[in-house]
Amino acid sequence: MVMTPEKKMSIIEEYGQHEGDTGSPEVQVALLTARIEYLTEHFKSHKQDYHSRTGLLKLVGQRRNMLKYLAKKDVQRYRALIQKLGLRK
């Protein structure tokens, strides 16, 4: 399992708008980012795992689409999220 339920709940509590909020874009992007970071570390020791690399590219695309949606809907929340996650430089 990539992410323990405790870690997932801590991310949901940190980025959610209210208790039990799993659908807001901030939570979804934060969960995707955690999975992407895990897979990035995985590829440092498993360089030829091409099947998982395909999954990583899919996750990155999902995160990009969610960030694009959030930027279109609410720029302030988008900027706060990318700063908190450290996604853009």
From Swiss-Prot:
One of the primary rRNA binding proteins, it binds directly to 16S rRNA where it helps nucleate assembly of the platform of the 30S subunit by binding and bridging several RNA helices of the 16S rRNA. Forms an intersubunit bridge (bridge B4) with the 23S rRNA of the 50S subunit in the ribosome. The lineage of its organism: Bacteria, Pseudomonadati, Thermodesulfobacteriota, Desulfovibrionia, Desulfovibrionales. Belongs to the universal ribosomal protein uS15 family. The gene is rpsO. The keyword Transmembrane helix does not apply. Transmembrane segments: none annotated. GO terms for cellular component: cytosolic small ribosomal subunit. Gene3D superfamilies: 6.10.250.3130, S15/NS1, RNA-binding. This is Small ribosomal subunit protein uS15. Coiled coil: none annotated. GO terms for biological process: translation. CDD domains: Ribosomal_S15p_S13e (cd00353). One of its GO terms (molecular function) is structural constituent of ribosome. NCBIfam families: S15_bact. InterPro entries: Ribosomal_uS15, Ribosomal_uS15_bac-type, uS15_NS1_RNA-bd_sf. SMART domains: Ribosomal_S15 (SM01387). Pfam families: Ribosomal_S15. SUPFAM superfamilies: S15/NS1 RNA-binding domain. Disulfide bonds: none annotated. The keyword Metal-binding does not apply. Keywords: Ribonucleoprotein, Ribosomal protein, RNA-binding, rRNA-binding. Part of the 30S ribosomal subunit. Forms a bridge to the 50S subunit in the 70S ribosome, contacting the 23S rRNA.
